[in-house]
Amino acid sequence: METKNINVCETFPDGTPIDGWFYDTNVPSLEKIGKQYVLTAYGILDDGKLHTKEIQALIDLAAKDGGGVIVVPSGTYLTGALFFKQGVHLYVAQGGMLKGSDDCSDYPICETRIEGESCLYFSALINADGLDGFVMCGPGTIDGNGMRSWKAFWLRRSWNPKCTNKDEQRPRLVYLSNCKNVLIADLNLQNSHFWTTHLYHCDHVKYLNCRIFSPASPVKAPSTDAIDIDVCSDILVKNCYLEVNDDSVVLKGGKGPWADTAPENGANERILVEDCVYGFCHGCLT
């Protein structure tokens, strides 16, 4: 655990004190997160088959039984969109990979938030709404498997240079909305179809020791922002490696001529990004 002398008065630019929450970089062990639901113990195998229904059923079972942690062991496990519930967490073990389907039809259309507006769009690979205390961690990898979408996007751009992300829709890797007290730690998050992680109306979220990556070549991964922070407060991004074919950390709050008046929009407050390393990206902070 890294600690600082919290008696030293450090403040945000507006003079607000940086409280002790920002200095606590503890990551709980797997044993402390909760009862373990290991994929292979429930017949979900590293066999190249799509296991969305089985993994979602395991999430639902854990929630029904009082919570726990879905454990992705060594191997590669293919899935579409997953929807986490209160008290259910995610741990990806060393050598483990939760790999997203490359077929966008495996990500149901839902009411969500894109480009500063509420709209219908694909769900993400990992979805959580209204959760308190959600943990995503482990030394393994969550891979969006986005190559097929990237190629489709650039093909469309070749005949319609003005096409947007709403014209050529594709899923995000992680979307958290209305959540609080979230920890995302030690993970490799890579190859998202679209934005890699997106927080909307969340507070007290920590990214610790993560590697977030999408390629700029040989096929550019379009609009794969590493961390989109959208109408959020109290966010810590610390000791992460960020290399994406767009912006690394993005502050969003609304878009368009009525952005300042729409009730779903707003400011981001108390955002701290420190001790991070940046590879190729369009901007470190935008």
Predicted regions mapped to residue ranges:
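Short, histidine-centered active-site or binding-site loop motifs used for metal coordination
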Residues: A41-I44, N188, G253-K255
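Carbohydrate-interacting regions of secretory-pathway proteins
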Residues: K166, A226, D275
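Alpha-helix capping and helix-loop boundary segments enriched in small/acidic/polar residues
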Residues: D46-K49, T224, D228, A259-E264
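Extracellular "leader-to-stem" segments immediately downstream of a signal peptide or signal-anchor
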Residues: M1-N178, L183, F194, L208-C210, ...
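Parallel beta-helix/beta-solenoid
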Residues: K85-G87, A93, L131, V174, ...
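Short glycine/acidic-rich loop motifs that flank beta-strands on beta-rich extracellular proteins
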Residues: G67, G80-A81, S101-D103, N145-S149, ...
